[in-house]
């Protein structure tokens, strides 16, 4: 039984193929619940995100995982075979650690993937498809991810617009829990801004959007994290003073936040500072507002230069993180080998004791029937020696016949070292 990782990601498969083999939690839970009754493949975890679908399992071969993935999604194996990657044992462990650490992500170092892998493990545990051995691999991968994030800078620099705005707000205002944020337009970019700031723990989110339906949708997505208020687009100017942070991305051909509106808002705020972020092209905010005392204005180019610099820093940190992951993977593999050796040694010792007990019983019976004690003991020693060294002798003969001279030489030298050690006089 080996540990396998098999799947597709944004590098190996198109979004159309990834959509075909994606799982939602409910469907995956039902599939796993059925799978635990199959002896051939009942020990598995499935990680499914927008950028990857991967199966991690203890199995006899990778082909069974590939077939399961295809069958579960009602597609032909031939559609997958040229797009999947597969890793076994050491490589699979290293891959899992890289995934959990964000080193294999589309956005290098992104933190969400660790939570997604943890959720995948929890779902499999609930379905009872996780053995202690598989669980220990995942727990060590989480430990590796924690080390990578705490000891390297791979995840410490903003590399998306939404995250960059949130980090900027944290730099300008030291206490996010007191902030009121206004997002002007609720499109994809500002939705990410709103979600990042909500996760950061701001006090209130004001959504100003032309379409009430889209504003309601965004409000529902973040309402569990932050107090939300929706205002009409026509009420934008008169509500500006309420916002500590304003992020605008309307797609309008004309500016929607005028210099005079910001000046009035500052006066109403008693000149408390404002962070204004203009993510639109053409620009939404009159660039002259930057001249107002207390206003910090950032545009797309400002943020992009920060993101480019941060991404370069992440890539540099990723080199250090890769070294750490390889070291931790080696540690886990060594630990597993030692554990396996312990089991083998225990079985070998038990086997030897059984042989000894049988030979002892045979010798005692010979003595009971009047056998010469000296002859019985000599026969006992000879028979015991022959049976104990037989497996090692056979192993050495087979190694000599094999096409790997290095293994034979290693085994021969190792046995010689054992003999030399035993011959040393005891003090």
Curated annotation (Swiss-Prot):
Chain residues that bind NADP(+): 185-190
Top-level EC class: oxidoreductase
Residues the record marks as active site: 50
Catalytic reaction list: (S)-4-amino-5-oxopentanoate + tRNA(Glu) + NADP(+) = L-glutamyl-tRNA(Glu) + NADPH + H(+)
SUPFAM superfamilies: Glutamyl tRNA-reductase catalytic, N-terminal domain, Glutamyl tRNA-reductase dimerization domain, NAD(P)-binding Rossmann-fold domains
Residues annotated for substrate binding in this entry: 49-52, 105, 110-112, 116
Subunit organization: Homodimer.
Stored PANTHER family: GLUTAMYL-TRNA REDUCTASE
Family label: Belongs to the glutamyl-tRNA reductase family.
Official protein name in the record: Glutamyl-tRNA reductase
């Amino acid at each position: 039984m080996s540990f396998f990782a098999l799947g597709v990601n944004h590098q190996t498969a198109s979004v159309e193929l990834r959509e075909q083999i994606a799982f939602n939690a409910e469907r995956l839970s039902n599939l796993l619940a059925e799978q635990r009754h199959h002896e051939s493949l009942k020990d598995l975890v499935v990680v499914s995100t927008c950028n990857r679908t991967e199966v991690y399992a203890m199995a006899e071969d990778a082909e069974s995982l590939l077939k399961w993935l295809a069958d579960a999604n009602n597609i032909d194996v031939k559609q997958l075979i040229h797009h999947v990657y597969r890793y076994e044992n050491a490589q699979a462990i290293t891959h899992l650690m890289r995934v959990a650490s964000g080193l294999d992500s589309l956005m290098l170092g992104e933190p969400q993937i660790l939570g997604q892998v943890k959720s995948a493990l929890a779902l499999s545990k609930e379905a009872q498809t996780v053995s202690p051995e598989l669980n220990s691999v995942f727990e060590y991968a989480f430990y590796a991810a924690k080390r990578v994030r705490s000891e390297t800078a791979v995840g410490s620099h903003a590399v998306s617009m939404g995250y960059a705005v949130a980090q900027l707000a944290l730099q300008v205002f030291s206490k996010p829990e007191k902030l009121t944020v206004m997002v002007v337009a609720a499109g994809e970019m500002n939705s990410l801004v709103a979600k990042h700031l909500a996760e950061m723990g701001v006090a209130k989110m004001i959504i100003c959007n032309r379409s009430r339906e889209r504003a309601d949708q965004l409000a529902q997505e973040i309402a569990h994290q932050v107090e939300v208020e929706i205002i009409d687009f026509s009420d934008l100017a008169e509500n500006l003073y309420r916002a500590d942070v304003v992020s605008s991305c309307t797609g309008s051909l004309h500016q929607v936040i005028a210099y005079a509106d910001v000046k009035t808002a500052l006066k109403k705020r008693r000149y408390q500072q404002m962070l204004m972020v203009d993510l639109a092209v053409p620009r939404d905010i009159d660039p002259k507002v930057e001249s107002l005392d207390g206003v910090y204005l950032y545009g797309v180019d400002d943020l992009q230069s920060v993101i480019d610099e941060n991404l370069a820093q992440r890539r540099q940190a990723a080199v250090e993180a890769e070294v750490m992951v390889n070291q931790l993977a080696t540690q886990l593999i060594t630990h597993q080998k030692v554990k396996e050796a312990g089991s083998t040694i225990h079985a070998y010792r038990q086997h030897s004791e059984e042989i000894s007990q049988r030979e002892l019983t045979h010798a005692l019976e010979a003595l009971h029937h009047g056998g010469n004690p000296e002859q019985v003991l000599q026969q006992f020693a000879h028979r015991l020696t022959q049976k104990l060294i037989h497996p090692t002798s056979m192993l050495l003969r087979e190694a000599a016949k094999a096409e790997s001279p290095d293994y034979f030489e290693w085994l021969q030298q190792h046995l010689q070292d054992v003999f030399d050690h035993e011959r040393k006089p005891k003090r």
